[in-house]
Amino acid sequence: MKSKSMCTTVGLIAMCLAGSAAAAGKPLYQTGPALSRSAAATATAEPSLQRVLSSPSTANAQVVQIDAGAVAPAEKLLELQLDGQTITATQAKVDALEGGDSIWYGNLGPRAGTRARTLSGVDPLNSAILVRSGDTVTGTIRYAGKLYRLRPLADGRHVLVQVDEQRMPQEHPAEYSLLPKFDMPNDGRVTAAQASSGSPATIRVLVVATNQAVTAYGGNMQSLVQLAVAEANQGYVNSNVGITLQLARYETTSYAETGNFTTDLQRFRVTNDGYMDSIHTSRNTYTADVGVIVLNNSSYCGLASGIGSTAATAFASVYWDCATGYYSFAHEIGHLQSARHDAATDPSTSPFAYGHGYRYGNSWRTIMAYACPSGCPRLNYWSNPNISYNGVPMGNASTADNQRVLVNTKANIAAFR
């Protein structure tokens, strides 16, 4: 409702200004000048910043001075500088992490995309998820559909990166077409006519990052992993899946990557082969249903061990720069639950004819879908004909209902450990 006061007197003007200041968000960061790709070649550039600037998917980048204290439950509004504009992020919720760290979720813009929200209360094209760990902040920001990443550098600074999603690596190596299919027990509680998420399930994930990935990223890898888990959980909420993904354990490995996704994933998965065998002890100790290895391999975004899984095959790999914002971390776990790509890209009907991701023209796509012909943002949603985005159903009952797949396989995968 508009105010009837025009603040015409000096006193009222002062009061209005004070009220505006009180309503303004706390700045999350102060921006510096935009960086050019040529800056990556300078001898003084920090190595992880060099990699950011030389990445094909970097549309632009700038070093920022972060205020990590802004990522706190008490901060209901944050100010972000994006595209030369001051954008307000409105807090949706805050999750506490061990050690006093936190994850801050919010919506961006005036009224924060009210029309676009579904039952989750979050607009996927205008939202932010920020992970605070000490003096560092790692986050994914979407504004007007554009993808931004906020990440710490090894020298203590932070960088804000706008990502060109059309220049991200290919989804999978050619071996994807040869992946085995595993028939998972299907509890059948969700049929095409139902929108139920069934009983809730908790899936625990062990994440192992190679030292090569940690060095190449240069930031706080554990926070990046926590961000990937938070994004996965937001996607489950958005699509009424009824899964909570828990980070059972994060650790690193000195295993030397081969540069081949299939080889590295096999060595991660197989027991007693002389490669990373200790991770299986960790998996049992920390009761992790699923294992994911984070690699420094920019050839592709990731690879799962199969379409569907057993307790012995529930392992996947992901390139660190695809894990968040592009949702490859959740995407690969989706494969382990029998989810497939969009039907145009991946027409196989095994194990479920309805088990594909969804693309809506050139406007958007869901987590399991490949890029639209002319490019489109990937929304943090699983295909689901019972949920709409801006009035458009996010799937169909015959070929694009990943939610139904995940709901009907979640109890099985959650019982692997």
UniProtKB/Swiss-Prot annotation:
Task: Please state what class of enzyme this protein is.
Answer: hydrolase
What does this protein do, in the record's words? Metalloprotease, specifically cleaves on the N-terminal side of aspartyl, glutamyl and cysteic acid residues.
Query: Which sites are catalytic?
Result: 332
> Does the keyword section mention Cytoplasm?
no
| SUPFAM superfamilies given in the database record | Metalloproteases ('zincins'), catalytic domain (SSF55486)
For this protein, the record's Pfam families field holds:
Reprolysin_5
What name has this protein been given in UniProt? Peptidyl-Asp metalloendopeptidase
InterPro entries of this UniProt entry? MetalloPept_cat_dom_sf
Q: Which UniProt keywords apply?
A: Hydrolase, Metal-binding, Metalloprotease, Protease, Signal, Zinc
So what EC number does this one have? Answer: 3.4.24.33
Catalysed transformations (reactions): Cleavage of Xaa-|-Asp, Xaa-|-Glu and Xaa-|-cysteic acid bonds
Q: Specify the species.
A: Xanthomonas campestris pv. campestris (strain ATCC 33913 / DSM 3586 / NCPPB 528 / LMG 568 / P 25)
* Keyword Membrane belongs to the record: no
Residue span of the signal peptide, if any?
1-23
Cofactor, free-text remark: Binds 1 zinc ion per subunit.
Any GO BP: proteolysis
UniProt lists the family membership as follows: Belongs to the peptidase M72 family.
- Cite the binding residues for Zn(2+): 331, 335, 341
Q: Name one GO molecular function term.
A: metallopeptidase activity
